């Protein structure tokens, strides 16, 4: 069930892994869901949101036009992002990853986690964003023009930390210049936070008339399946630190969990028969109080048994070095 709130306005506008194959999501990449690549070539995966079948990486093998959908990784990094200013200005130069990240085209450059789902449904293609963090605008500057993306048809929020909602203000570029408004789907607890952090967007009656702020339509979601532009999303409740609830989402046979330190028992049944699992893995050696590290993430993969897994939310992890070891 989704409860539409709108906004308060002064004027009426409204992988079974055995052996385990560790794959990390590219710093920013595209995952194809059922059709050949027409955009600039990136690492790709294939799956059907309806049938759940997974194929290989060969971009020459496609499916029918009515199944054309894709996922674009807007960011795969931490809240601070990579590179960090503190590393680049450290005279001891202890972090080679951050120095590599400033090189043109470096895959070690990572912004806040988030994905864009380009879904072709009965009513055409929709662009559905999961999270708009504080680096969202930088991601959009790079990837929206590259893939010919102009509109944002909906934003679904996983939790109310800055790396998930810090870019809501930047949506004004779309609502002022591209489209009248953008629907936001958010849990009530996170909406209550937004009333404080983004009070002028939630209640536009407090702003100066004519001020250019994001025109957002807030929809409260429960921990039950809901539909956005013909696509069903099933919330995947997880813990993101002690007593802090975050949501992953299942759409088709793709399960996306970007911020997690513990998966409750009641969530595991929602992950059954998952084709592609995209999951949080902050560090290669250990977990933190709020995020899985790679060892714990691999344990969860063995338990969930998806057909394929990608890890996201990496900290200062040298992806190029890892790829060389695997080659």
Where are these regions (language model features)?
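Residues in the short beta-alpha loop(s) of Rossmann-like NAD(P)-binding domains
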Residues: 77, 133, 188-190, 314-317
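Active-site flanking residues adjacent to catalytic metal/cofactor-binding acidic residues
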Residues: 130, 158, 258, 279, ...
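Core dinuclear metal-dependent hydrolase active-site scaffold
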Residues: 30, 34, 43-147, 210-269
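Active-site metal-binding motif and surrounding structural segment of the metallo-beta-lactamase
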Residues: 120-186, 274-276
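Short aromatic-enriched loop/helix-cap "lid" or pocket-rim segments at secondary-structure transitions
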Residues: 82-87, 196-198, 323-324
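Residue-level signal for inorganic ion chemistry
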Residues: 71, 194, 309
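Binuclear metal-ion centers of metallo-dependent hydrolases, dominated by the metallo-beta-lactamase
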Residues: 3-13, 19-22, 26-37, 41, ...
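Active-site neighborhood of divalent metal-dependent phosphoester bond hydrolases
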Residues: 178-182, 188-218
């Amino acid at each position: 069930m989704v409860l539409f709130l709108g906004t308060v306005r002064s004027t009426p506008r409204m992988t079974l892994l055995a052996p385990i194959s560790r794959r990390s999501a590219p710093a920013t990449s595209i995952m194809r869901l059922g059709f050949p690549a027409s955009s600039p070539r990136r690492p790709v995966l294939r799956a059907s949101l309806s049938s759940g079948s997974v194929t290989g990486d060969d971009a020459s093998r496609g499916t029918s036009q009515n199944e054309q959908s894709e996922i674009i990784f807007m960011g795969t990094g931490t809240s601070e992002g990579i590179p960090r200013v503190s590393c680049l200005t450290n005279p001891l130069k202890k972090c080679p990853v951050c120095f590599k990240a400033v090189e043109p085209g470096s895959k070690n450059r990572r912004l806040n986690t988030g994905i864009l789902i380009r879904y072709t449904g009965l009513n055409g293609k929709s662009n559905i964003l999961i999270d708009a963090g504080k680096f969202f605008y930088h991601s959009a500057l790079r990837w929206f023009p590259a893939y010919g993306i102009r509109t944002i048809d909906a934003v679904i929020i996983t939790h109310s930390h800055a790396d998930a909602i810090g870019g809501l203000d930047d949506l004004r570029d779309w609502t002022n210049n591209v489209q009248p408004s953008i629907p936001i789907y958010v849990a009530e607890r996170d909406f209550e936070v937004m009333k404080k952090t983004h009070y002028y967007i939630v209640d536009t009656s407090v702003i100066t008339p004519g001020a250019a702020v994001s025109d957002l339509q807030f929809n409260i979601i429960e921990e039950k399946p809901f539909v956005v532009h013909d696509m069903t999303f099933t919330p995947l409740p997880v813990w993101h630190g002690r007593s802090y609830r975050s949501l992953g989402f299942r759409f088709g046979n793709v399960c996306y969990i970007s911020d997690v330190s513990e998966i409750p028992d009641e969530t595991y049944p929602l992950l059954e028969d998952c084709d592609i699992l995209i999951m949080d893995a902050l560090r290669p050696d250990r977990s933190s109080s709020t995020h899985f590290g790679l060892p714990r993430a691999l344990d969860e993969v063995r338990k969930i048994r998806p057909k394929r897994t990608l890890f996201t939310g990496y900290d200062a992890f040298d992806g190029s070095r890892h790829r060389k070891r695997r080659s």
